[in-house]
């Protein structure tokens, strides 16, 4: 959840919103200090258990939009990227609905390639967008923020041109709302390079996660001056 930017935007657009957060303090701080509106359903708990439980309910609740946005950058909760968990989310999407999956990592590492491979194994129709263009020439690292939009249908989908109301007065939304830097032919790009991530079989990812965490740290060091990190 972080500070609640995404759920706040959904609520502002009149979308009935359910927010899932494992840490009650994160939800409390988002509400108290970052103005997360109260008119939403909050579920405090493990998303893996929550998704499993939602499939046992009757009638099963489905969602038009699902945002899968957890901290990654080498410390990702890998259980939230397993084929089993993503299958569970797929079954919660309403007909014609969409899921957006945010992942930050080094796209040259097996962990990132395997996350993409696993997502594409579940959803038949995905479009992938990088935060920054592919570096030229390619170096030893390719750390970027990645958003994967997927649907359960096979029809081509596009993004409409945003209007002023979509930005909610935010310069950041104005700059980033329209997806850019699409990775074309993503299935062909990762084919044969990654493994399907399965529940209970994730130990092999640990080395890649450590390298990705180092890459994320180097990126964060460029966000603020050294003195800030040294003081912190």
Locate each region found by the language model.
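The AdoMet/dcAdoMet-binding core of the Class I SAM-like
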Residues: 1-100, 107-116, 120, 141
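Soluble small-group transferase modules, centered on the S-adenosyl donor enzyme superfamily
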Residues: 125-232
